[in-house]
């Protein structure tokens, strides 16, 4: 139960949009001109001031080493100020705004803040951005030491932000991962739904124990979910440094469960490790699970722990994060079930409004002028932990660029942009199977999701800023699903989910006929009377089948007559039962073949 609530809490954070850090370069060379220049990575915020894209257009200015101070008070300013120079000062003790304001007042043309910790974008509020007109950037402490070692203390530098390709090749990888996860998860959810009904009909309890329970989402649950989204987002906004580790821990737990759920069907097919552990009284282990299942559980937990320990290793940790994220999304898609298109529409539209409000409306409500959503997704600039929320697929940029010197800029896609439309795709596949529509809803909705994602990438290229993907995915998937149902004249059934049955459809009841031999007709008795007697006394036919002489002895053998009648009726019911089972089996086999 605790794990279920943890997953629900994590799901409430999945629609957070992501932002991109702004990387630039500082080109450093000796004032004497005796050595070749060298580029170093910097992290800046273009809201303070823009940097030129071409090195030839950047001003080459003297770098003044002031790393002995933090530039938080006028006493930290040297005599003569920073006239037309770029001071290098240490990070800490005051805000970025206080540092850059002192530098600008004293004639600086830019500011480099040296950080011993991980680089974060230097942030401020809207009024502070309007007041400052010189660029400010963060430089790592190791790069500062390399500058002093390579060029001495008399150096010049030029800050610039080289252009990058509008779209990177990594977008193809993100597209394949996202669409593939939605398609596989939706298909799996529909197939699993049919299998559950099949197992329930057969009353095969042993087989059902291996399956995870599904959760049918109701309108009340959707309302609770939205309230949790809003509450958790506001709590993260005010208590980010404390709650971010809780979210990371929940992600590790949920991702390990998702990975186990995805791999267990394959592990159960292996012929090895079927033996069970000995009898014991330990919790869970008293059920004597198979050795191979225990090994799988240990493996899944180990993968999550490894990611949790090395999550900030940009060279390879993103591969583990993507694998765990895809497994988690597949698990959620096959576990959470929306029973009606009405519920799907409600969920998608509510989250659509949720995104719009927290991205575009909250900047007018906060003191800093920043949206709550962006502030939480990017991590507050004054965060002491500098941790990032992990609910994203991330792929490093693949195009060659001078910015490859930096900490590998990533392209990101939130799990919510996969799960929320994916629940609609899963509903479409289950509806396809129920109405036997050759998966037209499933295919159309999956294609619509892919088109919506492509539109998101185009908007990203045109606006050169991170996009809330649900802004494009929700209209594409909802309109497409609605149009298909309208075209097939199944809108009422699709809207209410009335095509679904709690159990498998029952075949029509067929009563087997009882073959009775005809009595020899008496010419002296009217035909209508003979037919009436035959219908009223079918047992007589059974008796005459055994011996013609029994007809004359009928009054003396009433007990035998009753006995024979019961046998005849029992045989009739048995034949009808066999026919019913045959029809049910044919119906089940038809659904299984349709899935295959």
From Swiss-Prot:
It is a multi-pass membrane protein. GO terms for biological process: membrane protein ectodomain proteolysis; membrane protein intracellular domain proteolysis; membrane protein proteolysis; regulation of immune response. It is an enzyme of class 3 (hydrolase). GO terms for cellular component: cytoplasmic side of endoplasmic reticulum membrane; endosome membrane; Golgi membrane; Golgi-associated vesicle membrane; lumenal side of endoplasmic reticulum membrane; lysosomal membrane; plasma membrane. A motif (PAL) lies at residues 468-470. Residues 192-219, 264-289, 337-344, 430-441, 488-596 are cytoplasmic. Residues 22-170, 241-242, 311-315, 366-408, 463-466 are lumenal. Glycans are attached at residue 93. It comes from the Eukaryota. Residues 575-585 have a biased composition (Basic and acidic residues). SMART domains: PSN (SM00730). InterPro entries: PA_dom_sf, PA_domain, Peptidase_A22B_SPP, Preselin/SPP. The chain crosses the membrane at residues 171-191, 220-240, 243-263, 290-310, 316-336, 345-365, 409-429, 442-462, 467-487. It holds the Pfam family PA. One of its GO terms (molecular function) is protein homodimerization activity. Residues 1-21 form the signal peptide. Residues 53-147 form the PA domain. Its EC number is 3.4.23.-. It is found in: Cell membrane; Golgi apparatus membrane; Lysosome membrane; Endosome membrane. Belongs to the peptidase A22B family. The PAL motif is required for normal active site conformation. The catalytic domains embedded in the membrane are in the opposite orientation to that of the presenilin protein family; therefore, it is predicted to cleave type II-oriented substrate peptides like the prototypic protease SPP. This is Signal peptide peptidase-like 2B.
